[in-house]
Amino acid sequence: MICISGIPGTGKSTICNLLNDLGYTCVEGNALAVKYGCLSGDEVDVDCLSDRMRSDNFKGIVAAHYAHLLPCNIVIILEADESALRQRMMDRGYSPEKIDENLDAQRSDTIYAESLERLPANRIFRIRNADLNVALSDILRIIGGRNG
């Protein structure tokens, strides 16, 4: 399974939709959580989701801010410019505290560090999403025709 992760506003959903348009199977993590009954209120139970995906032998690409915590073969971390991220999160109604928390997560490499606990560095990729076409091209090069 290929996992696309990153803080909110980095382009995970947009990339996932573009991959689907190209014939890949990319699913939003929250949709899988609903399908597998792994929601606890508004929160995704990552352990439940991981277990259900393993038992279902899920093959595909998953996009979510927590995707790197799932049973991934490859993790792609999307990153973006802080000013663009701040504006996107403001547009989505995030509180100033939540925006700062998310930006701090990108600055401190939290997702990369958590990914390293699960995978070797040569299976973790960072993509700077400044230009959507370049980011998509980089991702296609990484996944090399694999669909999970």
Swiss-Prot record:
Q: Per the record, what are the reactions this protein catalyses?
A: AMP + ATP = 2 ADP; ATP + H2O = ADP + phosphate + H(+)
One term of GO molecular function? ATP binding
**Top-level EC class, please?**
transferase
Q: What is its EC number?
A: 2.7.4.3
Chain residue ranges for the region called LID: 91-101
Keywords (A to Z) from UniProt: ATP-binding, Kinase, Nucleotide-binding, Ribosome biogenesis, rRNA processing, Transferase
Please list where the region (NMP) is annotated.
28-44
Q: Which InterPro entries match?
A: Adenyl_kinase_AK6 (IPR020618), P-loop_NTPase (IPR027417)
**What residues does ATP bind to?**
G9, G11, K12, S13, T14, R92
Q: Which domain of life is it from?
A: Archaea
Write out the GO biological process terms.
Answer: ribosomal small subunit biogenesis; rRNA processing
Identify the Pfam families for this entry.
Answer: AAA_18 (PF13238)
Is the keyword Nucleotide-binding in the record?
Answer: yes
Q: Its function?
A: Broad-specificity nucleoside monophosphate (NMP) kinase that catalyzes the reversible transfer of the terminal phosphate group between nucleoside triphosphates and monophosphates. Also has ATPase activity. Involved in the late maturation steps of the 30S ribosomal particles, specifically 16S rRNA maturation. While NMP activity is not required for ribosome maturation, ATPase activity is. Associates transiently with small ribosomal subunit protein uS11. ATP hydrolysis breaks the interaction with uS11.
Subunit structure, as described in the record: Interacts with uS11. Not a structural component of 40S pre-ribosomes, but transiently interacts with them by binding to uS11.
HAMAP family reported in the protein's UniProt record: Adenylate_kinase_AK6 (MF_00039)
Similarity-based family = Belongs to the adenylate kinase family. AK6 subfamily.
Protein name, as recorded: Putative adenylate kinase
